[in-house]
Amino acid sequence: STPIKSSAASDVYKRQGLKEEEDVTIQNHQDAVEMLLKVLIEKKIVHCLEEISGVGHRILHCGEFYHDSVLMTEESIKKIESVNDLGPLHNPANLMGVRAFMKALPKVPNVGVFDTSFHLTMEKEAYMYAVPYEWYQKYGVRKYGFHGTSHKYVSYEAAKHLNKPLESLRLITCHMGNGVSLAAVKYGKCVDTTMGLTPLDGVPMGTRSGTIDPAVVDFICRKENKTAEEVNRILNKESGYIGFYKKSSDARDLRKAQAEGNELADLILKMQEKKVVDYIGSYYAYMGGVDAIIFTAGIGEKAPETRYNICARLKEPFGIEIDEEKNQIKGQFLELSKPDAKIKVLVVPTNEELMIARDVMRIGNIK
């Protein structure tokens, strides 16, 4: 096996707001896990390995197998391996980590938490593509959606804040970071989401195009003499923010450039906001109303301009108004809507690690 050199690997741990990082050279995932466990003891995070009650693994894709997080066994690993072609960059590495922990801590429950499973409650009318049906039967071509752990977490937290059962609420969750996806959550279940077979679909993002006419791929292949694979890479890595404002894919840099009069930075930000509003309107109609709109992730939590601009576009159709002073606060749990608002607007900082930990406790039956 090829050693993972220091430039590509770093040992990072966080505890109670503290963060330490050091470059290391390791041979493989097993070495990485052994080193991590050693560090946990050295830093007195645990006194011995017996104190570790469970391990949670963020895994990208479970195909259509698991509507919930699952205890990792040889059987569940084999099922996930069978859909590796749906997540070729992430799934194999995710499973190497699972196997390494199962070997290092054989008596401890390992729980797989999937980015896609929260969205498996969608109806066929929402997740199917109008392409030859056999593509779905043979290859699983359909909408899967991503960021599921985040959408699930903020839905639970919003219900808690509103002091209502999640099963009684219609929510639109807006996960807006370098990757962006929205989900329509009706009575506790996802009924639609913006990302598709891959995370490329939906809203324009930091480096991704979002939804485009699929014929663009063939058109550019012929015009630029490129392969479909090359164009796919450009749509994933060189589009969105970076496709317009060539200097950065960071929303903060684009806001600064916009303020300085950069027309393309201004345009792509407005395109993104419009697309978010389009989806919110669509989900409102599909769910027959909405009780709360939730912003989360880097942009959702820390970009007041984005929140304001989206809500301003929703004022006329839905009567949404937010407290502009409160909206200037970044990175905190906020209720931005007026007290008597029919549709609440919340900022809920996401915490995927906590959601994973909760699932480990629940699925692993840890008291």
Residues of each region from the PLM?
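Internal helix-turn-beta structural module
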Residues: 266, 270-286, 291, 300-366
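Single conserved hydrophobic/aromatic residue that forms the stacking wall/gate
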Residues: 2-9, 13
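Short beta-strand-loop/turn "lid" adjacent to the catalytic site in phosphate-handling enzymes
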Residues: 40-90, 109-111, 117-126
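Glycine-rich phosphate-binding loop of actin/hexokinase-like ATP-binding domains
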Residues: 118-223
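Catalytic phosphate/nucleotide-handling subdomain of diverse soluble enzymes
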Residues: 186, 192-224, 233, 297-328
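Phosphate/pyrophosphate-binding loops at sites that engage ATP/ADP/AMP, CoA/4′-phosphopantetheine
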Residues: 39-53, 158-165, 280-291
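Glycine-rich beta-strand-to-loop/alpha-helix junction loops that act as flexible
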Residues: 57-60, 176-178, 290, 294-302
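Adenine-nucleotide phosphate-binding core of ATP-dependent small-molecule kinases
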Residues: 233, 240-244, 251-286
